[in-house]
Amino acid sequence: MYARYQRDQGYGYVTANSTGSSIIYGAVPQNAMVALNQVLKPNLLNEIKVGLNAPKTRVYASTPNVPGVDLSGVTISLSGVVSLGGTAGQQGSVGIASPTGQLKLSSALNGRAAPFTNYSLSFIDNLTWIHGNHNVKFGAEVRPEHLKTAFYGGTTYSFANIQAFLADAPSQVAFNGDTTALSPFTGKSGFSLMHQTFYIGYVQDEWKIRPNVTLSYGLRYEYYSPLHESNDKVLWFDIPTGTLIPNYTKDWYTMKTTNFGPRFGLSWSPEKSANKTVFRVGGGIYYGPGLTEGQTQPGVNDRINRTITSGPLLTYPDTPTTFLSNYNINDPNLQFQPRAYLPGYAIPEQIFQYSASIQQQLPSDTVLTVGYVGSQGRNLFLRGITNRITGVVMDPVTGVGSAVREFSVVNGTTVTNKFAEIDTKTSGGSDNFNGLQVMLNRRFSKGMTLGSQYMWSHSLGNSDGSKDARTSADNYSQSSEYGDNISDVRQSINLSALYELPYGTGQAHGATTNPVAKALLGGWQLGTLFNARTGTPLDIEIVRPDIVYRNKVTGAISAGPVVTGGVVMTTPIVNVPGGGASRNVRRPDLVLGVNPYYVSDGTLYINPAAFAVPQPGTYGNLARNALRAPGISQFDLTVSKKFSITETKNLEFRAECYNVLNSAIFAAPGGGTPRLNDATGIIQPGQPYTQSAAGGTFGALTSTVSNQVGSGTNRQFQLALRFNF
């Protein structure tokens, strides 16, 4: 019998941007385990475990201390660019940094803090039965999961430019309330207390058919009960009826019960190879519950949120009290924005994995392995929108167009929207991965070890999985998202070597030399590491308004109506079918015959002239993740020296140099999603972008992979001293 308890505590501080805004992280993970091992019979062993895992985390937004200015829970979003005035080595203009007292709490919610106090219990029993050439294992686990969560919101003020900011004239004010506040929908307050339980069972047999043939096969079953809120503090949006249901008690999604996962593996070493050749093949079906954050939306919905684009509340600054006191859940034009699940949303996600390899021992203690690995993902997480735009009505006097949505109420030219555009989640995504692996390794022998790995692979799909899934650019189909996944790295190589100077006690040379020489020349090790890979995918996106205006005479497209002499000269039309501005995942058209990459050694990497604004009423034809970031490579070096103190104690000094050649290792432009500016009225649909229209830093290499110690940095040195005993 044994018991274990571990508690860690750590804090992190990350600068958000150049304004001094930052994010503070705190984590206090705890885990405990009690286990009892029993020998029931000489060939029958049983293990019982009871465990606790309690990851307590806190994350806060921190703002700079400016006298007379309180940015707690506030974001100032400024559009436009600032000229750099010909600063040497820089682009002509840069975007404006936004002072903020908020951080990204989830994929669709910003706020000032998020405290999570979660824990899970594990009750596990494993039974091992050895019978002849069989090693059979049976096991079961019950794991209750408990989540105590909250999101503290904030206010975002958006300004069209610096002049509007100086005039205190925001174009939009977005307010998110706290999930712990008293809800006008459910009448409840406090933390969300969610729970679910995992049920897992398996049987597995390792059968040594012959001394050179081993077969492993088994079956695993997993079931994850749907999440529920303990007090039904839930606000459910029903998509078929377009209504809110407070204190919803039914399951939020379907949890499948047929989650059986067979697995097998076979290894064979031909007798004639003298155990120097091994063939391996295997496969299995695996299940996963998906990302928990994506399954908690009905609980997160139970809060006040509103977006102001006109009226007396469109002011700066304002207070949360103003938004709360004027909030009427029965307002027909409330524009409430919950998050919703499509009918048919089902869990779990499913992965089919399979592999085959051949391993051959070569002279000089070297082993060559060539293998294939593949997988197929099914029922993966997908995102989209509902309450889509279906049409436009125009004010006959001003020419202004108002979007008509699926749940809108239209009375003449007046449109009221109780709901804004709504983020949806569902299942049904797919992906596939195929990879060729080649490894050549030399075990530590005669003072040297060598390692080399190469992989060619390709990952495709219409979903990047729960954590990285993005909203479909086509609001009516997920099939258009099929393309390279963000994790797709076509080629990668890693080379490593470690050499120990053969001098000193136990070495080929210097074993009997004087102690001073052994102390100076013995115990040295030299290590090198080289890694390189091709670039990761780039998803080129574009900012487009949901509605644009077509001139009745010239056909030109503009961002707003044109009225001349009291006559409306334009017609409002739907620019992006269905809308989607809240998620802002839109792609441009690709201009044929134009190289999308700049052919130069400068920092401009993506050529905006290769892209154009799509015609109104159409989606861009550029595929998801169609371009590639620059590849990267890095060479590192380590030198170490051990000073023996006694037979079991020594002092080790290490000197490490990262990126010895000081190569520029640029990060993907735009964080992997370079976005073209909204150029409505600047260039017409079908007209290629210019650099100024795209944005001064569009497609530019402006940062390195990392500014910390390790991979992707500039040349850095690190010294370490360690006492081994």
Predicted regions mapped to residue ranges:
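Extended hydrophobic/aromatic segments used for targeting, binding, or gating
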Residues: 2-52, 56, 229-260, 389, ...
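Flexible, surface-exposed loop regions and adjacent strand-edge segments
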Residues: 8, 16-24, 63-82, 118, ...
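Short, solvent-exposed micro-motifs at the edges of structured domains
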Residues: 128, 195, 212, 224-226, ...
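Extracellular loop and loop/strand-boundary signature of outer-membrane beta-barrel proteins
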Residues: 17-22, 31, 35, 109-113, ...
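Solvent-exposed loop/turn elements at secondary-structure boundaries
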Residues: 67-75, 79-103, 229-425, 554, ...
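Surface-exposed extracellular loop regions of Gram-negative outer-membrane beta-barrel proteins
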Residues: 1-45, 49-50, 120-122, 196-224, ...
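Flexible, solvent-exposed coil segments and beta strand-coil junctions
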Residues: 8-17, 26-28, 97-108, 177-185, ...
